[in-house]
Amino acid sequence: MSNLSFFQTLSGLAENAKQIAKSSSLSFEENELSHSDLLRLLNSNSDAGKLEAINFILAQMMHGENMSLYFPDVVKLVASENPEIRRLVHIYLLQYAEFNPDLALLSVNTVQKTLYDKNPLTRSTAIRVMSSIRVPAINGIVLLAIQQCITDTADRVRQSAALAITKCYSLDPSYKSQLEEHIKTLLSDNSPIVVPAALFTFEVVCPEKLEIIHPYYHRICTLFPQMNDWDKVVALKTLVRYARLTLPEPSTPSTHSDLKELLESIKSCFFSLLPSTIIAGARAFYYLAPSNQMHLIVEPLLQLLLEKPIVRTTTLRYISQIVYKTPELFKNHIKSFFLIASDSDDTCLLKINILSRLLDAQNSSQILPELLYYINSHPNPSVASTAVKALGDFASANISMAPSCLNTLLLLLKSHNSLIVTEAASSLRLLIHNDPKEIYLQYLAATYETLEVPRAKSVTLWLISEHILIIPRLVPDVLRIAVKTFADETLEVKYQILELSVRLYVLSHSEEKQNDLESRDDVVSLLFNYVLSLIHFDMSYDLRDRARFYKELASTPSSEFTRRIVLESKGNSQKEIIASRDYCIGTASLCLNEDVMGYEPIPNWADVSDLPPDSVREGIKDVLPINPHTGNIYSNNSPGVKALSSDNFKRDFGDTNAINRPKFVGQQTLEEFYASETSESSEGEYETSTSESEDEETDDTSQEEDNEKNSTPDEDTENNNTSSISTKSIMDRPLTEPEPNYWQS
């Protein structure tokens, strides 16, 4: 019964939360504000009205609406005394300051004053707003603001200053030398959110000056595991390029110690919950790690196949690129690429593509049955045809398995699925052409009349034409069947019918030096003349020109020139392969298979003679501690903070009776009650004596102040030189002041 009420309570809470979310999401839609209402609220004297208007404007911005019309009315609120209004105005300015630089200049002075605000978030937003105003006239002011903010005590402000450097540089590149010095300062930071921003700025301002990173390399590697997931993605882009250009290429027996340090730091990416971080870590490991450590990227990538479809598809594209070069990494994980019911069409195609690259003689007993099942049972024809293509590729690469695959492909020619028949015909064209056998050609000739797909007919006629000497008796019958439907065939099939007819005619009349086509009455000549007459009325001018060319050649069938032109093989022994560039994994260009703006390939490993000495990276490795409550670093000038332990932890509170003991709660004996009263009275006496001593110290202090006022300048100088303090040191007082005992009567 109690369990039932518990679940009813949970159900009620969920329903209430749903209603609250629904009402909050519809708050702006239900209270739609017109243009005149917004202007009235923005110019009203009420802070509540201004907040309502700005909140509505920001909500519309999040829905993709252009709210730049209200820029003049919003920008003047930047001087509001309400901090919430100023914060929202800063957010608005971040969006539209770049598009309205002239009006944004009105807020420069006010925004500059907020750089001294007590709230770090306000200071951070202020430097972001100032750098977003695209006016060259204030670039010097922005540079001074950056110089101030890179030494701010709050790491969030220093991070915003680092990002502001990129905007300052894009507006005026002449400040590059000064900005490089600021980047060096930020790279020496101890905060894990500042260093990634500095690396991003480095990539924008001076990516070619890798010597800037040298002294901070070990510090960056130390801070890397502490960075958040998104920052790791940004930092790895620079670190991979730095390692490829300044560190020696790893080898299996030994790897450079600095590269080992980086690889150990990158391993933290594999435990992230963010897919992009895992992919970035796998990408860095793939391009930096030695071959004996490459297996570490397999499990994290396979784990991403359990994510949502878009992540699954993207990961499969990257795995496909890895398998293309190093298939042995995934040979033990074949079942991870078997199709499941929830896979999308793109996912299915990518998985079959990966299986085709992993397929070999050793694992064919596992993969081939899966491919045959997909061919016969998958509802998507494109997936089934891709499986046929994988089967044909495997048969081409493994001669020992070719006969069994050929039998399957020949049977697939009778399929009603045009895509399956097309892929089967394309695979057969390569397999039979490289190893022509009479039994296969006889089967193709016998099944030609049942074929319905133009591609299958075209491939069949091409194979028979190329190997016409193997089955010379069957060719006239095939040609006779083909010309029956000549007028209804596609242009591709018509070309092959013409090729077959002219070859058959030249071979049949090779002993005759010259003849008249119209006077011949044998079967081959009649078929050839019939084909020429059909082409004469065809709509394709290219086909008509080719027929006239072959007719002229056929007039001298025994000449060497005619035989070389007509009978020479015109087929390509290599299968048609769609060319694709070798894009780097972890890039959008690989997903789209085309160049995307901003794509940068991974540089090759630098030559050993061009590497800098290891001494250039001998920088400071220690990282200052970070305050876990504020996120700020402890100052270098502050006294060292030692870790607490049972050996060095001492509590000096003076008299232990001064500490308030917790009151006993519960039943007490009479002796225990009087003992507690005695202890309370002693605490009261201590409190009275403490207050009296404090009063005496106050009187002494006031008397000394009166003496200082009455002293002469000479006496003041003497007092300053001695600078003696008469009051007790603060360290001599108890750490915890005793609370007054209200129970003592």
From Swiss-Prot:
Q: What does this protein do?
A: Adaptins are components of the adaptor complexes which link clathrin to receptors in coated vesicles. Clathrin-associated protein complexes are believed to interact with the cytoplasmic tails of membrane proteins, leading to their selection and concentration. Beta adaptin is a subunit of the plasma membrane adaptor.
Compartments where located: Golgi apparatus; Cytoplasmic vesicle, Clathrin-coated vesicle membrane
Q: Which domain of life is it from?
A: Eukaryota
Pfam families, alphabetized: Adaptin_N (PF01602)
**Which named protein is this?**
AP-3 complex subunit beta
Phosphoprotein listed as a keyword: yes
How does the protein associate with the membrane?
A: Peripheral membrane protein
Task: Say yes or no: keyword Membrane present.
Answer: yes
Please give the Gene3D superfamilies that the UniProt record associates with this protein. Answer: Leucine-rich Repeat Variant
Phosphoserine occurs at 638
User: What's an example GO BP annotation here?
Assistant: intracellular protein transport
Subunit text = Adaptor protein complex 3 (AP-3) is a heterotetramer composed of 2 large adaptins (apl5 and apl6), a medium adaptin (apm3) and a small adaptin (aps3).
Cite the record's Acidic residues compositional bias ranges. Answer: 680-718
Disordered: where is this region?
Answer: 674-745
Identify its protein family: Belongs to the adaptor complexes large subunit family.
Instruction: Report the InterPro entries cross-referenced here.
Output: AP_beta (IPR026739), ARM-like (IPR011989), ARM-type_fold (IPR016024), Clathrin/coatomer_adapt-like_N (IPR002553)
Keywords in alphabetical order:
Cytoplasmic vesicle, Golgi apparatus, Membrane, Phosphoprotein, Protein transport, Transport
Q: Which organism is it from?
A: Schizosaccharomyces pombe (strain 972 / ATCC 24843) (Fission yeast)
A GO cellular component annotation here is: Golgi apparatus
